[in-house]
């Protein structure tokens, strides 16, 4: 691929994430590079991805999948549903161009997480960002994620009702920057931390860790949910500001 | 159409009735009433509140979570055509033995109501399309009620009637509360408490174009009933949807409902 071809591809796509493809070439994504870098650190620094199989759900342009590959993951599958399948959406193609430009091997697959089952495969790390807010049925999608996780699920989401100790979630519809020229109305949810803890425990995760978003605070939360099969040594990477919501571990 | 009446004596019928745990109190014969958790008077009030506004004559009705079948029988008595009573949890429960109780009541009442074991989480187009879908007292018993509503939309030709426990009433934003374990009424089968704004949001998102609401006839705002209509609804289905029914899908309706208290 020549630099001219790369520039043409960058200009031909509508970018959701700002990816640095060359020292002086950053895609003009909706999410700025600085925020993505901070999120990458928050999401992935606690984990040793060397040799890991990683599935990303809601990959957008694959920023975190590419980061996982850079961090030594053996296999990375980047998936998205709405941003890759709505009429006019070109984010999957953009992801493939980015992976090609960076010479990083990342598989891409348009996929509705509600349809995930164990038949799809098994991954040491499953990563899902902007999760609840883009799903009409996050309960079903969480089950899908659980079915393909064999160690750790890392989930980032919009939150709401933070002052209420009751587990709950609120619904909303909002314009997301993909699909048609003016974006698409997407219906989704915002849970609070007590609900996330309950849902993750009900799915069999016996250790759940939490931290606020690195730049947006408690408006968004990051959860790392470990299955009983995940060794305790994995917890060592989760230093402050991470807190263990299940300490002592749930039975 | 009615079926041949049962040949059981009153004493034999009472003996059979005692084999089951009843939820619906129903007079099966003069002087022979099932001893259910819900009294006859309350059920009569609910029947009038839930079904009274609609002309069911000749229309097909499916009752999701029918248990002992009270509302299925009521729909049939109100002139419905095909009526299909469905349940799974209470029909398979070793103490409730809901299906046997339903069949005993149906046979005794001589009503042509079909029964089908069906879990709401497994409903799909194979069950067929129904003019009216009754979803009474089930939403909050489901871990994933969103999936169930989506499935019910797929089998509703005209009207989905949802009756549910409610919570988060002070909040004008759409939301629902989760109940871990048995913290709601010491019943581990209770999972969610939605508020009216959320029910409106979900029903509109699923493609229902009109949504009406009323409080429970005796329990007030603690439970709500939603009549959600598809674009294909026939004018003749609705007899009267005046107060206490509220047109919920107009601007400010949820806020007005909350202000009314």
List the predicted regions and their residue ranges:
Chain A
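S-adenosyl-L-methionine-dependent methyltransferase catalytic module, highlighting the catalytic core
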Residues: 114-116, 123, 127-128, 136-251
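Hydrophobic adenine-recognition pocket in adenosine-nucleotide-binding enzymes
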Residues: 131
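Conserved N-terminal segment of class I S-adenosyl-L-methionine
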Residues: 1-122, 170-172, 193, 218-251
């Amino acid at each position: 691929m020549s630099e001219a071809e790369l520039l043409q591809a960058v200009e031909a796509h509508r970018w959701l994430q700002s990816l640095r493809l060359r020292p002086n070439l950053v895609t003009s994504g909706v999410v700025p590079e600085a925020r993505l870098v901070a999120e990458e650190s928050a999401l992935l620094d606690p984990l040793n991805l060397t040799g890991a199989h990683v599935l990303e759900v809601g990959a957008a342009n694959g920023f975190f999948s590419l980061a996982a590959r850079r961090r030594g993951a053996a296999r990375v599958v980047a998936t998205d549903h709405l941003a890759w399948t709505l009429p006019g959406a070109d984010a999957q193609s953009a992801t493939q161009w980015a992976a090609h430009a960076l010479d990083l091997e990342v598989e891409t697959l348009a996929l509705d997480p509600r349809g995930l089952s164990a038949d799809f495969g098994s991954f040491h790390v499953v990563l899902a960002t902007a999760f609840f807010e883009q799903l009409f049925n996050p309960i079903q999608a969480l089950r899908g994620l659980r079915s393909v996780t064999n160690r750790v699920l890392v989930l980032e989401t919009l939150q709401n009702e933070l002052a209420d100790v009751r587990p709950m979630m609120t619904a909303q519809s909002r314009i997301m920057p993909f699909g048609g020229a003016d974006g698409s109305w997407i219906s989704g949810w915002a849970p609070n931390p007590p609900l996330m803890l309950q849902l993750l425990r009900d799915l069999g995760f016996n250790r759940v860790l939490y931290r606020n978003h690195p730049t947006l605070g408690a408006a968004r939360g990051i959860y790392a949910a470990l299955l009983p099969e995940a060794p305790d040594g994995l917890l060592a990477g989760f230093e402050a500001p991470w807190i263990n919501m299940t300490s002592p571990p749930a039975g | 159409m009615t079926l041949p009446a049962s040949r059981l004596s009153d004493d034999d019928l009472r003996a059979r009735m005692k084999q089951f745990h009843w939820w619906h109190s129903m007079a099966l014969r003069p002087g022979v009433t099932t001893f259910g958790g819900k009294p006859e008077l309350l059920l009569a009030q609910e029947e009038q509140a839930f079904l009274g506004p609609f002309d069911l004559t000749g229309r097909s009705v499916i009752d999701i979570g029918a248990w002992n079948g009270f509302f299925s029988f009521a729909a049939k008595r109100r002139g419905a055509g095909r009526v299909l009573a469905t349940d799974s949890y209470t029909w398979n429960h070793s103490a409730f033995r809901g299906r046997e109780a339903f069949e005993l009541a149906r046979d005794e009442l001589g009503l042509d109501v079909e029964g089908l074991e069906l879990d709401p989480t497994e409903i799909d187009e194979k069950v067929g399309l129904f003019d009216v879908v009754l979803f009474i007292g089930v939403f909050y018993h489901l871990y994933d009620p969103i999936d169930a509503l989506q499935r019910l939309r797929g089998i509703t030709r005209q009207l989905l009637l949802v009756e549910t426990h409610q919570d988060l009433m002070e909040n004008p934003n759409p939301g629902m509360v989760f109940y871990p374990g048995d913290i709601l009424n010491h019943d581990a089968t209770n999972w969610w408490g939605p508020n009216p704004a959320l029910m409106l949001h979900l029903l509109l998102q699923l493609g229902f174009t009109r949504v009406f609401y009323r409080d429970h006839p005796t329990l007030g705002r603690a439970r709500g009933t939603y009549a959600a209509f598809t674009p294909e609804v026939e004018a003749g289905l609705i007899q009267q949807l005046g107060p206490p029914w509220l047109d919920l899908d107009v601007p400010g309706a949820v806020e007005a409902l909350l202000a009314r208290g």
